[in-house]
Amino acid sequence: MGKLLKPIKDVGIVGYGAYVPMYRIRNEEIGRVWGISNFPIEEKAVPGLDEDAITIGIEAARNALKRAKIDPKDIRAIWFGSESKPYAVKPSSTVIAEAIGATPDLEAADFEFACKAGTEALQAAIGFVASGMAKYAMAIGADTAQGRPGDHLEFTAGAGGAAFIIGEKSSETVAYFEGSYSYVTDTPDFWRRQHEHYPRHGNRFTGEPAYFHHVVTAAKTLMDELGLTPEDFDYAVFHQPNVKFPLVAARMLGIPKEKVLPGLLSGRIGNTYSGATMVGISAVLDIAKPGDRILWVSFGSGAGSDAFSIVVQDAIEEKRNLAPKVEDYIKRRKVIDYALYAKARRKYII
């Protein structure tokens, strides 16, 4: 048996949707407060006082439903990936399912795997639909990422998410999956213990042993298993903790940056963690043409990567205009100062 993950039935994306909060804080503003002058990105998205990973997931799910044009009651599974769930004990997926009118006849669960929790949910949704157990399944990745005040994570930890409704490949799918591959090891590059408020990072483990090793290995293995080369892809979306890492990974794989830039959003909204590649793919689907092939590689600390190859179909031409596009949310912005940011992110502890 080969390494490629490919279900017996062909499945695809029936609908997709993204959401990015309106507020932004510039890296210069964070640097002003902490006396730092080297910035990894321009600005990041900040959730409002009434927003969290669940509300972001709901907005993304509603947009996916608009594009799918299906009855939410036909969705038999909603799986939500996040590392910033509002409840330690209580599923976020049930709240989302209720909000979009999908209850009660469905599976629901929350997934965790750092920044690739959303694509873990996607792998499960692909298998669930392909098995014949469901007509449609929804996978969501959303986060309101946190960074310790003054830590370099504070400059990049953003907020946003995306949802994908999976169904059997048909004239209604906007793109179909050619195959996928997952690669995991026990690599301690990033963690947060129970009762700790902010995550810690393993510094020297972050780059080569973690991100680059897993992303490049997953991408290369997927291409080898499918008999494809970098030249066969029109776009590539990699996990984007910053702007630099995805471009370096692309260079290591022989992929020109022009294929990466359309889905590279972290410079403008930050690292949305579980939502990062899913929002990036949504942005690419907003502009892609039928027949375009997209390489999609997530990464989650701890560590692992999921790699997918998807091919865009004719239905994208109509469906992409049925809900707000990623660029619409990025342009809908209001810049705030550090004081309001700290209040919105509840960094003041009394």
From Swiss-Prot:
Catalysed reactions, as listed in the record: acetoacetyl-CoA + acetyl-CoA + H2O = (3S)-3-hydroxy-3-methylglutaryl-CoA + CoA + H(+)
Pathway: Metabolic intermediate biosynthesis; (R)-mevalonate biosynthesis; (R)-mevalonate from acetyl-CoA: step 2/3
Source organism of this protein record: Pyrococcus horikoshii (strain ATCC 700860 / DSM 12428 / JCM 9974 / NBRC 100139 / OT-3)
This protein's record includes keyword Nuclease: no
Entry keyword set: Acyltransferase, Isoprene biosynthesis, Transferase
Residue numbers binding CoA: R204, K244
Enzyme Commission numbers on file: 2.3.3.10
Name under which the protein is recorded: Hydroxymethylglutaryl-CoA synthase
Listed Gene3D superfamilies: 3.40.47.10
Self-association and partners: Interacts with acetoacetyl-CoA thiolase that catalyzes the precedent step in the pathway and with a DUF35 protein. The acetoacetyl-CoA thiolase/HMG-CoA synthase complex channels the intermediate via a fused CoA-binding site, which allows for efficient coupling of the endergonic thiolase reaction with the exergonic HMGCS reaction.
Family, similarity comment: Belongs to the thiolase-like superfamily. Archaeal HMG-CoA synthase family.
GO BP: any one term: farnesyl diphosphate biosynthetic process, mevalonate pathway
SUPFAM superfamilies according to UniProt: Thiolase-like
InterPro entries documented for this protein: ACP_syn_III_C, HMG_CoA_Synthase, Thiolase-like
Active-site positions on this chain: E83 (proton donor/acceptor), C115 (acyl-thioester intermediate), H239 (proton donor/acceptor)
Entry's Gene Ontology molecular function annotations: acetyl-CoA C-acetyltransferase activity; hydroxymethylglutaryl-CoA synthase activity
Cited function: Catalyzes the condensation of acetyl-CoA with acetoacetyl-CoA to form 3-hydroxy-3-methylglutaryl-CoA (HMG-CoA). Functions in the mevalonate (MVA) pathway leading to isopentenyl diphosphate (IPP), a key precursor for the biosynthesis of isoprenoid compounds that are building blocks of archaeal membrane lipids.
Residues involved in (3S)-3-hydroxy-3-methylglutaryl-CoA binding: C115, T156, T206, H239, N271, S301
